Amino acid sequence: MRYLTAGESHGPKLVGILEGVPSGAKIDKETIDQALQERQKGPGRGGRMKIEKDQITILSGVRGGLTTGAPIALEIINRDWANWEKIMAWGDEADLESRKVMTPRPGHADLTGYLKYRTEVRNVLERASARETAMRVAIGNIAVQILEALGVEIRGQVLSVGKVHMDSEDTPEYWQRVQASEWKVGDPKGEEALDAQLQEARSQGESLGGVLQIQVRNLLPGLGSYVQWDRKLDGRLAQAVLSVQAIKGVAFGMGFTAGQHFGSEVHDPIGYDSGRGYYRYSNNAGGIEGGMTNGEPVIIEAVMKPIPTLYSPLSTVNLETKEVMEASVERSDVCAVPAALVVLKHVAAWEILQAILEKFPADTWDELDKAWQDYKRFVSEQ
């Protein structure tokens, strides 16, 4: 499978094309729209989210609620385009002077993109913007729906925002609280501290980052491969996660703390039970060993840096005069960590489904489902 996206933050539309999805898979448009709406939510979001009401339009590749095997084309309308139509026009009528950006923002693609592509900063930031992730959520939700039909579950939580760290557990009640929380946390006391921290950051013109966790459950062992470097599933998941705007680090299982322990404290002892087959007594590896799933939940943690646009701007250099000035201010969020969690779940889902289709090549949903169930039976009998 593969996909491409196109579109600018303030252009008329975001578009996506994906191919390689088996035919006959059930796809529900409302479920995609719900994921898009979830991405728009969360404390700390900016004024743009009050303008947009993201919904997907399926242009091809799905008929009667089932994939056809043809490329799937998608689009999302940018409602804010109405306010930028003259500025973002493609022809000679474009107003190139209004909203021109001459003071690049530290931490953003502005300056480096300006140097690399020899184009205006406006053109750089329009494509580098995290607005692009709306389409990646839509594309990834197609993968989510197929994975769920196979019995695979993807969940996530926010572990920390700024200096506030959450107490985490793994019970049905806890995950219900996470799902109901605007912050996507299961710690009520922590949620109160997050609200207070957000108000402090907003009053100071600051922004906030955080640490997020994704869990992928009910995967069979053997997805990915140790045979070549580019087939290792943890490497591919890491690349997908790090490709999301503002994500600066990724870890699996124990992550970087593994370097602080003896090997006997890190590696997961193997057990066997006639009912469940082989299993691990712990999951410090985060569900991946040798680049392959081992049957335990895949646990991914990622760190999101604070958003580069600050309402109390840092210093920068004017591209024309070379004078030191304050960086430009674009309309932005104070905190988008819960929204980033939605994006990470969906980019991870795409990589997981791709790994499944590499192990079980299939042109149709029925072929994929049969291969998955046959292998599941084989694993349980070993």
UniProtKB/Swiss-Prot annotation:
One of its GO terms (molecular function) is FMN binding. Its cofactor is FMNH2. Its EC number is 4.2.3.5. InterPro entries: Chorismate_synth (IPR000453), Chorismate_synth_AroC_sf (IPR035904), Chorismate_synthase_CS (IPR020541). FMN binds at R127, A128, S129, Q245, A246, G290, K305, P306, I307, P308, T309, R331. One of its GO terms (cellular component) is cytosol. Pathway: Metabolic intermediate biosynthesis; chorismate biosynthesis; chorismate from D-erythrose 4-phosphate and phosphoenolpyruvate: step 7/7. It catalyses: 5-O-(1-carboxyvinyl)-3-phosphoshikimate = chorismate + phosphate. One of its GO terms (biological process) is aromatic amino acid family biosynthetic process. NADP(+) binds at R39, R45. Signal peptide: none annotated. Reduced FMN (FMNH(2)). SUPFAM superfamilies: Chorismate synthase, AroC (SSF103263). Keywords: Amino-acid biosynthesis, Aromatic amino acid biosynthesis, FAD, Flavoprotein, FMN, Lyase, NADP. This reaction introduces a second double bond into the aromatic ring system. HAMAP family: Chorismate_synth. Homotetramer. PANTHER family: CHORISMATE SYNTHASE (PTHR21085:SF0). Belongs to the chorismate synthase family. This is Chorismate synthase. It comes from Desulfitobacterium hafniense (strain DSM 10664 / DCB-2). The lineage of its organism: Bacteria, Bacillati, Bacillota, Clostridia, Eubacteriales. The gene is aroC.
